[in-house]
């Protein structure tokens, strides 16, 4: 077993830079000081979570914890006014919520055509869609399938049960 570091991370001193700049890399301080009544967890200066660049930026700029941010996004369901903002680099984002289809194995999530987007489950009741308004989707070059994957051999006695490839 490896030995654990023999120090406490308080997010101060030489570590203050990470705490102050983590949002630029998509991280947030998961349990910030002063949000204990909302998170139900005491302040943990060492506990960071990756949420993605746009979300980390918004959370940091608005002094929110993750629970507050998720509640805010729920107030912007698809079809209503999305949460829109511009980050410090001038990039524009649109964020909206899509509730999961209770009882179904799948949920249809409306997304924009031709613009980069990401979908993330909120681990509770739905999905957060992030639209990168300034980033059109570019067609990626097709990759060639390995030769062994180009054809499939089906036993003759089951061939009638297999739909023909189109």
Segments from the language model and where they lie:
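Ser/Thr/Gly/Pro-rich low-complexity, disordered linker/stalk segments of secreted
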Residues: 138-166
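Cell-envelope/glycan interface and biosynthesis
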Residues: 1-86, 90-137
